[in-house]
């Protein structure tokens, strides 16, 4: 481990902007893949939030809920049901974010059970890890754009199917006006 050339390790450490020098080269070698896995876990956490938001947007945009309406630019029609609006952009964002959530596991599986040192296996981590930053940024940008253009159905509670949603509030109101709880309920 290390180098067979007489390097000034202090100067190299300073030139590269590291705070301290790793005196134990074995420790430095044993860290391969660990930092990437930690960062990948942060990426996966953000992606999980975006995927859940995308799922909710798809659900709440559906005709069964209709809580929100997505702009036409973010949807496509169905060949068999032209009136249907498929939330393509949110569906693709959800899939991309779900893919990003697999990144820590991919890194773990590649780096797992390798002996100390550098092996070509670790090259595959870079192929997965480095593009993930751009992929996450694209998802963040797309969600930011979509959220700003979602229309909320402000009159959804006028629908009779939601009458029971506020039944507890109605019971409490009746109790406060003197109706016994059992009668109010």
Language-model features, listed with the residues they occupy:
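Internal glycine-rich alpha/beta core junctions
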Residues: 1-110
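Glycine-rich cofactor/substrate-binding loops
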Residues: 66, 81-185
């Amino acid at each position: 481990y290390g180098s067979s050339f007489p390097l000034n390790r202090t100067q190299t450490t300073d030139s590269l902007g590291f705070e301290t020098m790793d005196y134990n080269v074995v420790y430095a070698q044993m860290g391969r893949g660990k930092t990437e896995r930690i960062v990948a876990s942060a990426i996966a956490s953000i992606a999980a939030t975006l995927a859940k938001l995308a799922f909710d947007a798809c659900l709440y945009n559906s005709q069964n809920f209709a809580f929100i309406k997505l702009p036409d630019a973010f949807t496509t029609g169905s060949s068999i049901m032209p009136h249907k609006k498929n939330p393509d952009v949110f569906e693709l964002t959800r899939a991309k974010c779900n893919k990003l959530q697999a990144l820590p596991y991919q890194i773990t599986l590649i780096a797992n059970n390798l002996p100390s040192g550098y092996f070509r296996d670790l090259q595959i981590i870079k192929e997965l890890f480095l593009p993930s930053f751009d992929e996450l940024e694209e998802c963040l940008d797309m969600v930011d754009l979509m959220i700003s253009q979602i229309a909320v159905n402000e009159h959804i509670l006028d629908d009779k199917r939601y009458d029971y949603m506020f039944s507890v509030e109605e019971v409490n109101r009746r109790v406060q006006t003197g109706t016994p709880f059992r009668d109010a309920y």
